[in-house]
A protein has these predicted regions:
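Active-site-adjacent loop and "lid" segments of alpha/beta metabolic enzymes
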Residues: 1-30, 85, 100-117, 136-165, ...
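N-terminal accessory interaction module
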Residues: 1-79
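Catalytic domains of carbohydrate-active enzymes, especially glycoside hydrolases
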Residues: 116-132, 324
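Flexible glycine-/small-residue-enriched beta->alpha junction loops
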Residues: 97
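Glycine-rich, aromatic-flanked loop segments that form ligand/cofactor-binding clefts
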Residues: 73-91
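Histidine-rich, glycine-flanked metal-binding segment
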Residues: 57-69, 104-120
Length: 361
């Protein structure tokens, strides 16, 4: 059990109006909270925001975590495109693999059709398209980097030509290099730059944003390792250490996005604990990506629903992430997720408008 202090925002409210000094804004987004769950050495207690200043004055880590949690995340300028993290964004998943668990490899043989599917997701509201050429399902075979490059580069080139923002979902430096040369703007690595010794160098040289995803033992693959004492704290500490390591190697901290790795080397109970405690991860000071779309946990909680019948569960998990202040949702079902976000945004706007009107009376 770690002896470090951790802060998890809790007790969320609809509006900050009339609550000066009693609530704090979460990461510059559309959520406000009234207290922290403070954990240290396995012990937890609740500290209201109104009383937090005293704790911050005597504990440097508490002050630093509070600053990270409440600071707005800087926008990412990617060519003529800008990703702003003051409200949730959607990343559309585009797999070009023969053994994809979600689409059965339908797009692997036809780069033009794959790119068209990506453009369609962008039209439906995806801020970027995440292109992957290697399956990360459990027991999936390792793909030779040359084959992976052949799968993804023609698709990325077409997407970029259409004006679509692209991230490359890979753990291999050679694939990162080829994808970035083809116009991809972001690296999304399920190994958090661990798998390939050259990966960090590629990201540093490109100066591109990178998604660092947690898995217990990335050198063994995305599903290597298992077993946690406190999964939420351990994932936080792992990502905190990984961020420090890649920043020391030259990665710009303002260009790091973190992903808790739902479904990667984690049991159903681990995944549920992570989702219920997601707000803790804002203490890392980075935008958070959540990839829970169509995951096995949805089937486990819904009478073993097959992959193509997990839309409801995917939306439920996306909304859980949104309520926790997640900035980027990685999903298969873009139109439905975007609609859910718009309805959520309408509810938020209505609560704020009503509170301002009441305050002016």
């Amino acid at each position: 059990m770690t002896g470090k202090l951790h802060l998890r925002p809790i007790q969320f409210v609809d509006t900050p109006v009339g609550r000066d000094g009693e609530v704090a804004r979460l990461a510059g987004g559309m959520a406000w909270f009234a207290a922290y769950e403070v954990s240290k050495g396995g012990k937890r207690r609740t500290v209201p925001i109104a009383e937090f200043e005293a704790l911050a004055a005597r504990d440097e880590r508490a002050a630093r975590l509070h600053a990270a949690i409440t600071s707005a995340r800087p926008a990412l300028t990617l060519g003529d495109r800008t990703l702003r993290f003051d409200q949730p964004l959607v990343a559309g998943i585009l797999n070009v693999t023969p053994d994809s668990f979600s689409d059965g490899g339908k797009l692997q043989e036809d780069p033009a059709a794959a790119a068209a599917a990506g453009v369609d997701m962008a039209v439906k509201g995806a801020a970027l398209i995440d292109v992957g050429g290697e399956s990360t399902r459990p027991k999936a075979p390792l793909v030779w980097e040359g084959d992976e490059i052949k799968r993804v580069v023609p698709v990325i080139e077409r997407l970029v030509k259409s004006g679509t923002l692209v991230s490359t979902d890979t753990r291999k430096a050679a694939v990162m290099e080829a994808a970035l040369a083809a116009g991809a703007a972001i690296v999304n690595d399920v190994s958090a730059l661990y798998w390939d010794d050259r990966s960090t160098e590629i990201v540093v040289r490109a100066g591109c944003p990178v998604v660092l995803m947690h898995s217990p033992d990335p050198k063994k693959g995305p599903h290597g390792g298992d077993g946690y004492g406190d999964v939420l704290i351990e994932v936080f500490d792992w990502l905190e250490a990984r961020i420090a390591a890649v920043v020391a190697a030259g990665v710009d901290p303002a260009k790091i996005i973190v992903d808790p790795g739902i479904g990667f080397g984690k049991s159903l109970q681990d995944n549920l604990a992570l989702l219920n405690g997601l707000t803790l991860l804002h203490g890392l000071g980075c935008p958070i990506m959540l990839g829970a779309s169509r995951k096995r946990m949805i089937g486990a909680l819904s009478n073993e629903a097959p992959v193509d019948a997990r839309l409801g569960g995917s939306i439920a998990l996306a909304m859980k992430g949104i309520e926790a202040g997640v900035q980027l949702l990685r999903v298969h079902d873009v139109a439905e997720t975007v609609q859910a976000i718009r309805v959520w945004r309408g509810l938020k706007d209505a609560a704020l408008t009503l509170s301002f009107e009441r305050a002016s009376l």
